[in-house]
């Protein structure tokens, strides 16, 4: 019988995998979220690991670090407010400094870090100007004649 053990580098999963292997009547496959653990490497060497399947997908939660999740929640609210009226909506963020942010290494991280520095220096906002801001659709409608020759 073939048995797949998930969480094999944890205490419970590791124990299950070892017990099944020691029994000798089972073929065992193990799955782990962290293939870089020393315990896994030692176990693989000891047992004569035959295959490693590695997923090359990036960990999007690590890359984005949750910085834009709140923006997405707010956007959803504005698109479908009737679904959120009277509901509790949880928004959270971390306290990342501009220096930490620019080290994230994605394209535009330095620009965003500089924007955060600017906002920290000038916390006052011109609310009247903000209220006059247009959506892209409004601006395009107002300026569509400017694009007629293109």
UniProtKB/Swiss-Prot annotation:
Keywords from the UniProt entry: Cytoplasm, NADP, Nucleus
Subcellular localization, as worded in the UniProt entry: Cytoplasm; Cytoplasm, Perinuclear region; Nucleus
Binding positions (NADP(+)): 7-12, 33-37, 71
This protein's GO CC annotations: nucleus; perinuclear region of cytoplasm
A GO term, aspect molecular function: identical protein binding
InterPro entries: NAD(P)-bd_dom_sf (IPR036291), NmrA-like (IPR008030), NmrA-like_oxidored (IPR051164)
This protein's record includes keyword NADP: yes
Pfam families named among the record's database cross-references: NmrA
Record function comment: Redox sensor protein. Undergoes restructuring and subcellular redistribution in response to changes in intracellular NADPH/NADP(+) levels. At low NADPH concentrations the protein is found mainly as a monomer, and binds argininosuccinate synthase (ASS1), the enzyme involved in nitric oxide synthesis. Association with ASS1 impairs its activity and reduces the production of nitric oxide, which subsecuently prevents apoptosis. Under normal NADPH concentrations, the protein is found as a dimer and hides the binding site for ASS1. The homodimer binds one molecule of NADPH.
Family: Belongs to the NmrA-type oxidoreductase family.
PANTHER family noted in UniProt: NITROGEN METABOLITE REPRESSION PROTEIN NMRA FAMILY MEMBER, NMRA-LIKE FAMILY DOMAIN-CONTAINING PROTEIN 1
Subunit architecture: Homodimer. Interacts with ASS1. Interaction is enhanced by low NADPH/NADP(+) ratios, which results in inhibition of ASS1 activity.
Protein name, entry field: NmrA-like family domain-containing protein 1
Protein's organism: Rattus norvegicus
């Amino acid at each position: 019988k073939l048995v797949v053990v998930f969480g094999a580098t944890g205490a419970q999963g590791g124990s299950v995998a070892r017990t099944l292997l020691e029994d000798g009547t089972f073929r065992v496959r193990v799955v782990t979220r962290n293939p870089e653990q020393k315990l896994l490497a030692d176990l693989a060497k000891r047992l004569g690991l035959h295959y490693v399947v590695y997923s090359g997908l990036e960990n999007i939660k690590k890359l984005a670090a949750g910085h834009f999740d709140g923006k997405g929640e707010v956007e959803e609210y504005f698109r479908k407010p009737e679904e959120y009226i009277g509901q509790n909506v949880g928004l959270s963020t971390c306290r990342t400094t501009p220096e930490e942010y620019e080290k994230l290494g994605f394209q535009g991280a330095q620009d965003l870090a500089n924007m955060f520095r600017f906002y920290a220096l000038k916390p006052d906002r011109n609310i009247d100007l903000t209220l006059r801001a247009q959506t892209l659709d409004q601006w395009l409608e107002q300026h569509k004649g400017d694009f007629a020759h293109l």
